[in-house]
């Protein structure tokens, strides 16, 4: 299994987004270093996902979009949950968004806050980050963030 961090296209763009792919152990090391630098914040348990049956959704199409009932309301509620920062005002990327591959939306503001913490770090760039992570976060902070799959 690999975690995929995928840049969200800006303004509904159709250009294939850039992505980063990590195996679980490597991602765990990256998250540990990001936590040490203050780039990641623990916001407590992740929010609960909306129950599709409550919205009258009866099925999903081949692309995974809900069908029936108030499908649009369900999608809107799901989008709010996937973007939710958590129970804190501390800037940074919420830990729960990086630990699971459920389609979390790491927002541009969360990415920008993480990059600001990185830029304030007085030491050398951590080797665990490699050469692509920080440029990816900068691009996500300037755009619409990224999704974790």
Predicted regions and their residues:
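Acidic (Asp/Glu-rich) sequence patches and key acidic residues
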Residues: 1-149
């Amino acid at each position: 299994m690999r975690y995929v961090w995928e840049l969200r296209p800006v303004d509904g763009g159709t250009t294939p987004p850039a992505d980063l792919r990590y195996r679980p152990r490597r991602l765990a090391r990256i998250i540990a270093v990001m936590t040490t630098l203050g780039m990641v914040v623990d916001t407590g348990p992740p929010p609960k996902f909306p129950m599709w049956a409550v919205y009258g959704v009866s099925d999903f199409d081949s692309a995974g979009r809900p069908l029936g009932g108030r499908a649009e309301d369900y999608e809107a509620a799901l989008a709010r949950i996937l973007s939710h920062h958590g129970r804190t005002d501390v800037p940074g990327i919420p830990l729960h968004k990086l630990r699971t591959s459920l389609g979390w939306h790491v927002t541009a503001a969360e990415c920008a806050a993480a990059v600001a913490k990185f830029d304030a770090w007085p030491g050398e760039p951590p080797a665990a980050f490699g050469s692509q992570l920080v440029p990816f976060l900068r691009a996500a902070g300037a755009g619409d963030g990224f999704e974790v799959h």
